[in-house]
């Protein structure tokens, strides 16, 4: 048993990573905290603060570049103050960042921040003249030039979605509305929230061959394509493409996560960019909650387990839940099909009519899917599916079915070649 009397060590020669883990483990053994997660969090935050302080002191002593005197009490203590422009001192032509004044909610906005600019770390942005708070902001990114939105202590979340607006010229709002009309992020917004989103978007015109986002980088923008075409790469492999009405970058918007893919324009394109720092939490929380719910559900569907996580993300975003009462027909034999169904909860009965006689051929439960044959073959429904008790299904339209289920279409087609598989899998 490892105790504080017998310190834990990984190896005789330790790098920074193993040294940190060793120190954490020894402190844990010495203190035996009840809340392990909080203890670990406090440990790493403390170490980060110590490192930042050491860097700041060393850098100040060498170059005297930073003024550590607190000259303003206007900002919320968690908000990051504007960094100085060091381009003249270092002989490097950096693009100057013009930071706005804090608004009523203590937020700073980068007035001229271009979402298509290089998002790589800048050396001098690694140091802040503000002491590290006890807990970092949720959108904290080490070494990045960011605009941090903070909520005052004791205040309630504002109902308005977006606090950063770009007043749209005549006709621009209509263009944005057309571009986002079918986007999953904005389906459930009320009128006021919808207008806030429209006013928060900025137009970006990019030429052919432009890398809009790069895999692994940290980004703040979500993009909707108004016109043009773009290719999506994971590593060196092209996985999909985008055209008018398509969107990408939602991981940055919802989770502040690194870019999952690289997007490159294949023609001159017009994009609408939405900054995560001007998007209120309620928009992101609603979408994130829906995605988490569907991702958990999709992980139980055998057909979809082979999909990559980004593919499951896209499917989860496109799914919509529908409900049926006991005895209600979900699909009817002979009808034209335009929806694919996956059962979320409840049961359904598959009925097939032959020679004027209808008989039950299968019973479906959670995780079962049906409706794919009509979409694969542009054929009428092959059977009738009826709710057996209250039934909840996740649905996917025909276009989304073809676009998002590409990796499993071969599996579906192989199943459809066998009559018995058809009866077991599909109406």
From Swiss-Prot:
Entry annotated with the keyword Ion transport: no
Entries under Pfam families matching the protein: cNMP_binding, RIIa
Region (Disordered): 96-145
Annotated segments matching region Dimerization and phosphorylation: 38-184
Highest taxon above the source species: Eukaryota
Alphabetic keyword roster: cAMP, cAMP-binding, Nucleotide-binding, Phosphoprotein, Repeat
Skewed-composition ranges (Acidic residues): 110-124
Positions that bind 3',5'-cyclic AMP 1: 185-300
Signal peptide (UniProt feature, chain positions): none
Keyword Transmembrane (UniProt): no
GO molecular function list: cAMP binding; cAMP-dependent protein kinase inhibitor activity; protein kinase A catalytic subunit binding
In-chain residues carrying the UniProt-annotated modification Phosphoserine: 147
GO cellular component terms listed in the entry, alphabetical order: cAMP-dependent protein kinase complex; cytosol; nucleus
Binding site for 3',5'-cyclic AMP 2: 303-422
Quaternary structure and interacting proteins, as annotated: Tetramer, composed of 2 regulatory (R) and 2 catalytic (C) subunits. In the presence of cAMP it dissociates into 2 active monomeric C subunits and an R dimer.
Similarity annotation: Belongs to the cAMP-dependent kinase regulatory chain family.
Designated name of the protein: cAMP-dependent protein kinase regulatory subunit
Provenance organism: Mucor circinelloides f. lusitanicus
Annotated gene: pkar
């Amino acid at each position: 048993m490892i105790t504080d009397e017998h310190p834990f060590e990984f190896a005789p020669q330790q790098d920074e990573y193993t040294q940190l883990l060793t120190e954490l483990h020894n402190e844990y053994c010495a203190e035996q905290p009840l809340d392990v997660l909080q203890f670990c969090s406090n440990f790493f935050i403390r170490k980060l603060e110590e490192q930042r302080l050491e860097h700041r002191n060393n850098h100040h002593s060498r170059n005297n570049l930073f003024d550590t005197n607190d000259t303003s009490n206007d900002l919320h203590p968690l908000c990051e103050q504007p960094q100085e422009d060091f381009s003249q001192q270092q002989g490097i032509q950096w693009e100057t960042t013009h930071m706005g004044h804090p608004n009523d909610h203590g937020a700073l906005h980068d007035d001229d921040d271009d979402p298509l600019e290089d998002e790589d770390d800048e050396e001098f942005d690694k140091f802040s003249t503000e002491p590290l708070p006890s807990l970092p902001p949720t959108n904290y990114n080490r070494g990045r030039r960011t605009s941090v939105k903070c909520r005052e202590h004791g205040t309630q979340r504002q109902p308005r979605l977006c606090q950063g607006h770009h007043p749209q010229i005549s006709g621009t709002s209509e263009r944005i509305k057309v571009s986002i009309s079918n986007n999953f992020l904005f389906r459930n917004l009320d009128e006021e929230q919808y207008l806030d989103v429209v006013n928060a978007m900025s137009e970006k015109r990019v030429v052919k061959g432009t890398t809009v986002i790069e895999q692994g980088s940290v980004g703040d923008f979500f993009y909707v394509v108004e016109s043009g075409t773009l290719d999506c790469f994971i590593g060196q492999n092209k996985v999909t493409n985008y055209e008018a009405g398509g969107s990408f970058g939602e991981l940055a918007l919802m989770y502040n996560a690194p870019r999952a893919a690289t997007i490159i324009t294949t023609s001159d394109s017009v994009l609408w960019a939405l900054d995560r720092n001007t998007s209120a939490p309620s928009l992101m929380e609603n979408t994130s909650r829906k995605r988490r719910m569907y991702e958990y559900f999709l992980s139980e569907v055998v057909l979809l387990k082979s999909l990559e996580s980004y593919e499951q993300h896209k499917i989860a975003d496109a799914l919509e839940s529908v409900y049926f009462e006991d005895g209600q027909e979900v699909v009817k034999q002979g009808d034209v099909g335009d929806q694919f169904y996956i059962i979320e909860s409840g049961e359904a009965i598959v009925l097939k009519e032959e020679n004027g006689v209808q008989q039950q051929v299968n019973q479906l439960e959670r995780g079962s899917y049906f409706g794919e044959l009509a979409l694969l073959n542009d054929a009428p429904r092959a059977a009738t599916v009826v709710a057996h008790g209250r039934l909840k299904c996740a649905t996917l339209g025909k276009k989304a079915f073809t676009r998002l289920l590409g990796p499993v279409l071969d599996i579906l087609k192989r199943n459809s070649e066998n009559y018995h598989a058809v009866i077991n899998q599909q109406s």
